[in-house]
């Protein structure tokens, strides 16, 4: 059998990795796929090393939804690469409880789209689909009138490009949208991602609250559609905000949903879920939920920016002024049980205008590869998050970047350490490793037999010392 193990192991100092492939216990068959060490699924033991969550780098504001039909209520964005361009779908309009809405009265029951060639510079296409103030020269693709038959809410949507190879071309693009008649999640379809129609008058999900961004995608590994939506633990709108899921072979009908599980995690109100297959390792599901934290009024709360607007929102409901939000990170191998990190993936950051508000750090659903700002460096992953939700006249779309596969790493101190995997079965002829060391750090790899003894020719002594910073170094 040829030996192949592709692992994401990033360390900035030194780590020794002991990889076990043949042991008495049943091995985990990883084939020839890329594996990320985002959890303990493949790890038997850590000696002197630890798993560390990495946070993306805050970059520039790439877009502001400040057109007359847009505003500070823009949210529930979806982003994906579509051929040679990128698309962001987002809610337009002002938040109905904001000061700006009192004067403009532009409804947030709209869906807009922006496009980009590089994921950094975004423009509004002039589509001629929806009329606003007597003109169709805008980037609107949906308004409330277009979905009134089923009480659809363009303010609560998720848009995706269906990767199911059997999907009809005229239904390649899909919108998950909340409807009221009857209450549930509905599916809209399109062949171009701009002109959508209702797929079925019957909702595909009816058990849940749905007052959030609810989503669906094709799981290419499992060969099923997965849907994730908002629900409350006590039913209706009572209790802690949580996430339910269901799977189906068809996107138009799902069985009774089940609650996600988070072993060893503290209870946390999760406002969104943003779950998706990781595009470089689609057997791993990643979620970036927005965490909802009502901190109440305190001297510290009054020290945060935007006190006047915070107090204005609190007059409508106290939590509108006292809730602050950030983004978390979680992963799953089965789409149901998630390892959720307690630390924030994106924090509110330095206290400044349009930060530390309810809806801040809402990560868009989706991630895309973009060029590094360093010439000659490999591509990075770009994520996007909202700032300034329901403040001022518009939100801001902030870009964040993170290393390819670099969400979590195995990290060691200068004194070094070891990682021993569980028994593995794999195919291939070489090992590739995503890693980073200091100028003084290094990595070595060893293969052991079922007794924990090094396999001749694959010992630490046989492995050349690896140092540097590369995404796909072939270990020799």
Regions inferred by a protein language model and the residue ranges of each:
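Aromatic (phenylalanine/tyrosine) cluster motif
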Residues: 4-5
């Amino acid at each position: 059998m040829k030996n192949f193990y592709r692992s994401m192991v990033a360390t900035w100092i030194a780590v020794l990795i002991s990889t076990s492939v043949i042991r008495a216990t049943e091995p985990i068959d990883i084939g020839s796929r890329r594996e990320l060490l985002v959890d303990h699924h493949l790890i038997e033991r850590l000696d002197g090393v630890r798993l560390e969550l990495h946070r993306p780098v805050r970059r520039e504001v790439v877009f502001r939804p400040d057109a007359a039909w847009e505003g500070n209520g823009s949210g529930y964005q979806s982003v994906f690469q579509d051929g040679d361009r990128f698309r962001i779908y987002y809610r337009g309009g002002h938040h109905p409880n904001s000061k700006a809405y009192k004067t403009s009265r532009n409804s947030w029951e709209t869906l807009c789209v922006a496009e980009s060639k590089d994921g950094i510079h975004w423009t509004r296409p002039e589509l001629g689909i929806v009329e606003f103030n007597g003109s169709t020269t805008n980037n609107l693709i949906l308004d409330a009138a277009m979905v009134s038959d089923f009480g659809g809410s363009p303010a609560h949507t998720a848009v995706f490009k269906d990767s199911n190879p059997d999907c009809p071309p005229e239904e390649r693009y899909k919108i998950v949208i909340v409807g009221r008649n009857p209450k549930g999640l509905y599916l809209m379809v399109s062949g171009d991602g701009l002109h959508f129609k209702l797929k079925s008058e019957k909702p595909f999900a009816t058990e849940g609250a749905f007052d959030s961004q609810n989503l669906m995608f094709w799981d290419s590994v499992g060969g099923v559609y997965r849907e994730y939506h908002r629900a409350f633990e006590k039913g209706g709108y009572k209790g802690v905000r949580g996430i339910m899921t269901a799977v189906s072979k068809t996107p138009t009908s799902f069985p009774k949903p089940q609650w996600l599980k988070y072993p060893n995690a503290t209870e946390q109100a999760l406002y969104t879920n943003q779950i998706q297959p990781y595009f470089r390792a689609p057997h791993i599901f990643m979620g970036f939920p927005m965490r909802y934290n009502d901190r109440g009024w305190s001297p510290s709360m009054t020290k945060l920016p935007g006190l006047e607007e915070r107090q204005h929102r609190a007059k409508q409901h106290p939590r509108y002024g006292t809730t602050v939000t950030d983004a978390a990170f979680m992963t799953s191998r089965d789409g149901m049980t998630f390892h959720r990190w307690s630390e924030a993936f994106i924090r509110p950051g330095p206290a400044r205008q349009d930060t530390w508000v309810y809806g801040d750090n809402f990560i868009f659903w989706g991630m895309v590869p973009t060029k590094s700002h360093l010439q000659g460096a490999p591509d990075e992953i770009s994520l996007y998050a909202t700032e300034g939700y329901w403040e001022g006249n518009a939100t801001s779309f902030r870009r964040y970047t993170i290393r390819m596969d670099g969400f979590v790493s195995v990290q060691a101190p200068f004194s070094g350490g070891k990682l021993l995997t569980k028994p593995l079965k794999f195919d291939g002829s070489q090992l590739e490793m995503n890693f980073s060391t200091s100028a003084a750090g290094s990595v070595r790899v060893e293969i052991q037999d079922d007794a924990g003894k090094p396999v001749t020719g694959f010992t630490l002594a046989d492995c050349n010392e690896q140092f540097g910073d590369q995404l796909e170094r072939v270990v020799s």
